[in-house]
Design a protein with these regions (language model features):
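Low-complexity, intrinsically disordered short peptide segments enriched in small/polar/basic residues
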Residues: 2-5, 101, 112
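Low-complexity, compositionally biased segments
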Residues: 14, 21, 109-115
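Conserved active-site-adjacent core of cysteine acyl-enzyme catalytic domains
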Residues: 43-94, 100-109, 116
Length: 124
């Protein structure tokens, strides 16, 4: 089973509903505040809600260079077994998490949750 690390990362170290910003910040190596600004800019540019999948997917793919990876029918743990190395953003229904070298970083243990989207991030 993949490793799990409880990960809270934002400017004031408060646990909040910020999974998109937190996960993208960790996976990209960008500061939390910079990702928050990029999400707002992307939302204005594309006229979409910044937490809508199609909106933040554009940021992940077009700006940050993430590329889609097949994850059909997999849990995070299944995915980690197939992709033990590298940095990935993994989307579940209503949530997104980061997998780095066989370790899931998130505010809760989601290793058994089913993935709907996965992106491999370039090396930081």
């Amino acid at each position: 089973m993949a490793n799990y690390v409880r990960y809270i990362h934002n400017d004031d170290k408060v646990t909040r509903n910020d999974c998109v910003t937190r996960a993208i910040s960790l996976a990209s190596g960008l500061p939390y505040s910079a990702v928050r600004k990029k999400l707002r800019y992307t939302a204005r540019l594309l006229d979409c809600e910044k937490l809508c999948v199609s909106c933040y997917e554009w940021l992940i793919r077009e700006v940050l260079g993430g590329r889609p990876v097949n994850c059909e029918g997999m849990t995070i743990n299944d995915f980690a077994e197939l992709h033990p190395y590298g940095t990935y953003l993994l989307r579940m229904d209503g949530h997104i998490s980061t997998l780095i070298d066989f370790t899931v970083y998130d505010i809760f243990d989601c290793r058994n949750h089913r993935i709907t989207n996965a992106w491999k991030m370039p090396n930081n």
